[in-house]
Amino acid sequence: MITVRLPDGSQREFDTPVTVAQVAANIGTGLAKAALAGKVNGDVVDTSYLIEKDSDLAIITDKDAEGIDVIRHSTAHLLAYAVKELFPDAQVTIGPVIDNGFYYDFSYKRPFTPEDLVAIEKKMTELAKKDEPVTRKVMPRDEAVAYFKSIGEAYKAEIIESIPADQEVSLYTEGKFTDLCRGPHVPSTGKLKVFKLMKLAGAYWRGDSKNEMLQRIYGTAWAKKEEQEAYLHMLEEAEKRDHRKLGKQLDFFHFQEEAPGLIFWHPKGWSIWQQVEQYMRKVYQDNDYQEVKAPQILDRGLWEKTGHWDNYRENMFVTESENRSYALKPMNCPGHVQIYNSDMRSYRDLPLRYGEFGQCHRNEPSGALHGMMRVRGFTQDDGHIFCTEEQIAEEVTAFHAQAMAVYAAFGFENIDVKLALRPDSRIGTEESWDIAEESLRSALRACGVSWTELPGEGAFYGPKIEYHLKDSLGRAWQVGTVQIDPSMPGRLGAEYVAVDNTRKTPIMLHRAIVGSLERFIGILIEHYAGALPLWLAPVQIAVLNISDAQAEYAQAVAQNLKKQGFRVHLDLRNEKITYKIREHSVQKLPYIIVIGDKERDAGTVAVRARGNVDLGVMPVDLLVDRLNSEIDAKA
């Protein structure tokens, strides 16, 4: 007798081994029809999976996140099937699920065209309507290699050859197409009804620029048409908000080929930078961080001690001088340990908090660069806390409060907190990991927040808390982290004198709230579609005169506002006032002041708020009060 335990606590008993699909049918015909996969004892499997012992089972449908992943993975295979039908000489390589969709890489003798994409999507629809069963077959590795070589799929054969010889591999077949895959997949192609091919791109085989350039086709797939339409609408909105376009349109910054992955900040953009940096500097000061500055370039010997030279050198910019090797720092932590080591420390000094606006450089592949979101040079609000194990929870609790206050000030209210736990490959004892993970859980419980745990996602040296912001389009951005590191202080010789007069190694907490300032500003630009709140706006007020008769008064008003700390643009051009208003409105300024004869004579100003909102005529002092209140409220 086999007992199958269901999520609602009920049980089903079967005399013989039973498939997931059969259990679903036993529960009800509706569930049997909706079933896409199953979760047996925590593992997602095909509906054809045979349950041979007492097990926990959840039936996966398109209402589950795992079900959407199965749909997308299966649609990637459907894409490859369609390409092989239309272009038999194309070779298939890999096709994983990604956020909101999937991609598949192909090798083909000519570039695919947008017209090809239309034809491929049409063929996918035809194949899906056939509702062909998707079947799984397991075979020995060498047999699988021989099979793919026999059908001319050299890339698949190469992938399988990298698998240990004693391992079996699984193949999935739908119609005439067979692919290597772990699975799981939908039971038949008819389950794939809502999908769209999005774009073409290039990708190196195995991500190595020394290898052949393949052709990557991106797609998206959903359970319901309405969900896909909402996603495509979000993409349209995201395109309008693209920080690269807005950065050029609003004269914030630019990029050019002579400096890939680096930013040329214009005066307006640099003003935004300064507002963010100054705000974060006050966060340091208000929370007892000592601001420091470590060198940009450090000797190879230090990077060897930290392990970066052996494990991260490909991502570092390296140089030589006078027969010594150096690297531009890709991160700030080793420099902070050196500052800590510059003096003898006592337990009375701990916790010791350092903060730096540290400029880092990482040699990211050119194909991975993306505006300000992925760069080669960036500055972090990077802090490190040296403390004892007993102080971890209190420090993390305090950091959490700081981070949440910062996100609220910048206009982010929807924050997901995630706890990344020990990975398979790690250093340290199980006991040290237990202590570190429980310290973070204890801190989060003390904060009264809910969180999601991510098993296996921690760094090799310690667990971390991640902060994921959702922007105005519902997109998630991982920005802040606080991470426990018991390793680096010891590798670099950091010590403190304990209560019992022995030497001990401190724990180091890596913490950042906004992370890369460049990336965070890019997120802000897209979140607000360039219409930054008053306190961040590079130009807060434009002062416009209607004619030369008001020029002197307009200058006096502008000067008055500047003296009170506002960022003001004075526009005395001899243009029609409607033209000037329209031009400054396009620049998304928070406020526009218009001055005519009436305002000049009465010593007032006519005020327009962003969005062409007419606030009427008011004295300058009243406007100043309004502006200061808005800035103080970070509204």
Curated annotation (Swiss-Prot):
Record's catalysed reaction(s): tRNA(Thr) + L-threonine + ATP = L-threonyl-tRNA(Thr) + AMP + diphosphate + H(+)
Species of the source: Janthinobacterium sp. (strain Marseille) (Minibacterium massiliensis)
Annotated PROSITE patterns: AA_TRNA_LIGASE_II, TGS
Binding site for Zn(2+): C333, H384, H510
UniProt-recorded name of the protein: Threonine--tRNA ligase
Quaternary organization: Homodimer.
Cofactor note: Binds 1 zinc ion per subunit.
GO biological process terms on file: threonyl-tRNA aminoacylation
Cofactor: Zn(2+)
Broad EC category: ligase
Subcellular location: Cytoplasm
InterPro entries with a match to the protein in the record: aa-tRNA-synt_IIb (IPR002314), aa-tRNA-synth_II (IPR006195), aa-tRNA-synth_II/BPL/LPL (IPR045864), Anticodon-bd (IPR004154), Anticodon-bd_dom_sf (IPR036621), Beta-grasp_dom_sf (IPR012675), TGS (IPR004095), TGS-like (IPR012676)
Function in brief: Catalyzes the attachment of threonine to tRNA(Thr) in a two-step reaction: L-threonine is first activated by ATP to form Thr-AMP and then transferred to the acceptor end of tRNA(Thr). Also edits incorrectly charged L-seryl-tRNA(Thr).
Keyword terms: Aminoacyl-tRNA synthetase, ATP-binding, Cytoplasm, Ligase, Metal-binding, Nucleotide-binding, Protein biosynthesis, RNA-binding, tRNA-binding, Zinc
EC number from the UniProt entry: 6.1.1.3
Name of the coding gene: thrS
Matching PANTHER family: THREONINE--TRNA LIGASE, CHLOROPLASTIC_MITOCHONDRIAL 2, THREONINE-TRNA LIGASE
Region of interest (Catalytic), ranges: 242-533
NCBIfam families linked to this entry: thrS
GO cellular component: cytosol
